[in-house]
Swiss-Prot record:
The keyword Hydrolase applies. Pathway: Glycan degradation; glycogen degradation. One of its GO terms (biological process) is glycogen catabolic process. The record marks D443 as: Transition state stabilizer. Residues 459-484 are annotated as: Disordered. The active site is at D336, E371. This is Glycogen debranching enzyme. It comes from Salmonella paratyphi B (strain ATCC BAA-1250 / SPB7). Pfam families: Alpha-amylase, CBM_48, GlgX_C.
Amino acid sequence: MTQLAIGEATPHGATYDGHGVNFTLFSAHAERVELCVFDSRGNERRYDLPGRRGDVWHGYLAGARPGLRYGYRVHGPWQPAQGHRFNPAKLLLDPYARRVEGELKDHPLLHGGHDEPDYRDNAAVAPKSVVISDHYDWEDDAAPRTPWGKTVIYEAHVKGLTYLHPELPQEIRGTYKALGHPVMVAYFKQLGITALELLPVAQFASEPRLQRMGLTNYWGYNPMAMFALHSAWASSPEMALDEFRDAVKALHRAGIEVILDIVLNHSAELDLDGPTFSLRGIDNRSYYWIRDDGDYHNWTGCGNTLNLSHPGVVEYACECLRYWVETCHVDGFRFDLASVMGRTPTFRQDAPLFAAIKACPVLSTVKLIAEPWDIGEGGYQVGNFPPPFAEWNDHFRDAARRFWLPRNLTTGEFACRFAASSDVFKRNGRAPGASVNLLTAHDGFTLRDCVCFNQKHNEANGEENRDGTNSNYSDNHGKEGLGGPLDLMERRRDSIHALLATLLLSQGTPMLLAGDEHGHSQHGNNNAYCQDNALTWLDWQQANRGLTTFTAALIRLRQQIPALTGNSWWEEGDGNVRWLNKNAQPLSADEWQNGPKLMQILLSDRFLIAINATLEVTDIVLPEGEWRAVPPFAGEDNPVITAVWQGPAHGLCVFQRG
């Protein structure tokens, strides 16, 4: 290998052209950048990047090939009060690295210094970037492009979904390969979901605190390298990209979209006491929101916050998203703590990143889902994201739980949430699909735990049960824990059925947490982010098959109801919906606000949802006509009903006319 040629300022990252590798690095405040390459024995050779165009440093290394391990040492001022923390003693990951070798360990050499720089060299323990080739044969792959109105999302963890699946080959359980295996594809099709939403798959690290406690970051919301796949779920690190793309291709052939949960709000460098392994040492002032005293704005609760209004960071974020779409063919993203994306530092719908995404022909056409809050002032922004974003709807989650798990909730409030929360999302030209309805998610109780626990039980997390929310709107039905007498277990089953029916038969985009259709429990842990064990892994051998069948039947029923699949707002008199009381008459103003939780919802003039959320068996007079219960509510003896349905306490049934 020779000295570096000047090379080009684009594309960003390390790009192999068949003859060598072009390297680029964005840093607005650096004074000098060294490329450091390592041989198989760990010997290091350094090259100054000779070119600079604007804020991008670049150089070309002839003869370099995929597999080359590299990093950067970036020279510049150490001025903490101004937000500058350059320290060339620290080897830094390329933010655009497509593969990472080594883990981010809790090691003192990885700290760049607090008030004064730590000049101890860290190359021996620092993770390394690795040059790759992106070539892959996609064959005839095509994106399913499922319309929002027909979309049913299934949120899952790569490892936890398949690690205990007895029908999968042992060697692929808990890996990318398992996602596209025929056993899993067949299950997804049988269940009826249309999109698999994966918790973070970009390379992530366990926080030093967890490492010291003997725990790991299981969920993955602590990103190291946003362009690199987490290698632990591959047969080998060099195979991660191809194995992930194989899974995407297999899922696409079955008509199933792949959505990635992506963390663009903070990095694993954490606060000023965290490790310096990339952005902090490359250009701390540009990449992060810095306070006047040089510390970080912590709007994420993770110690730092990415400055997604800085032009260089906006470009980084957009290129990251485009990489996953163009190189890995993913169909969309769920953005963690997405209010950070709109901070300028206050939240704005025309924030630079939102504008860039909307203007991008690649990104503006995939599914974009915001978790519409962060922990900073003004961070709660449900309903305020611009199109084409959809949003997690916590109003729906809380209302569904409060309606069925006895709490005070009016019929009017329930109906509003059932109708895609039009008071929140019917703005800026957005359709009902912008409301992503959920009962549960990775963060919080599972559905089974919602009906078994009144209190969180997070002792295993090592924080003396202080972590996790206390606002669960759950109901143990009279006994804390999973067990109980038969009548209690039946009441819990009925509550689960009612909640699932509410989720899957409401207007908006439903999201189902993997395992809720099995009856999976985390034994009351509502913050299992550090539990990479049987607490979070789905136990397929113990799955409640009847509940799975019930859930699949609800999804099939949903796809038959035009009022739910049309993705247009319901208007009075359009035939999509009628709201009726227990006597099949329009609900009065008093019944909307003060009446018992009894109602009927007539959809598309032929599907009737009869609801008795009271504690008493109640007769409900059906609208005129002949009605027959539909699966999963129809029994073997399924007579035509022409007058009255005897609604059991906390009961729900769906009928079809004719």
